[in-house]
Amino acid sequence: MPKRPHVDGRRQFSDIPDGMETVERVVTDEKIAAFRASIANELVLAPLTKGGNLPFRRLCVDLGCNVTVSEMVFARYALKRNPVELARLRRHESEKTFGVQIATNQIAEGVNAGRLAFESGADFLDLNCGCPIHETWKRGLGAKLLKKPAKLERLVRGIADGVPLPLTVKI
């Protein structure tokens, strides 16, 4: 697959579905390098479904964790303003570096959820490609995405190009 075009170090918004506006803030290669440097050699709390809630993350920060990640957020429901999903986007002021993990199999959904995470104060976005829970599997989310590598590649590229945050992938 050809490399994404770069102009002045900025990522180009390609493969974004029609009707989606681009964001003013783009992720530059320098921003990605700075993000990587900021999490290098840091204690990172992995995203934990039904365990990585805000009180638990605060406890982990008190015990020395510097990078925290939300519980898995179903992108579709967050975009429908489901209060349970929106609560998972909350960040505490003690969280030095905070990421939001999303579950989606659609580029537009992932981009819009990423923008919501950005507006909520996240430092990075994490795409869940490792969850084996039946509920995610039957919806084509989580680990099920690994069954279709070409689709997964399009999804990752599309979300990475469309969100104003660095993107990580949990496998």
Regions of interest found by a model, annotated:
Residues M1-G19:
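Mixed-charge, low-complexity intrinsically disordered regions
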Residues I39-N41, R58:
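Non-catalytic, substrate/partner-engaging modules appended to enzymatic cores
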Residues M72-P83, C129-P149:
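Glycine-rich, proline-tolerant flexible connector loops at the mouths of alpha/beta enzymes
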Residues Q106-E109, P166, I171:
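Active-site glycine- and acidic-residue-rich loops that bind
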Residues L86-Q101, G142-V169:
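Alpha-helix-loop-beta-strand connector modules within alpha/beta enzyme cores
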Residues Q101, D126-G130, K170:
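Short beta-strand segments
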Residues P17-A33, L48-D123:
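Glycine-rich, positively charged N-terminal anion/phosphate-binding segment
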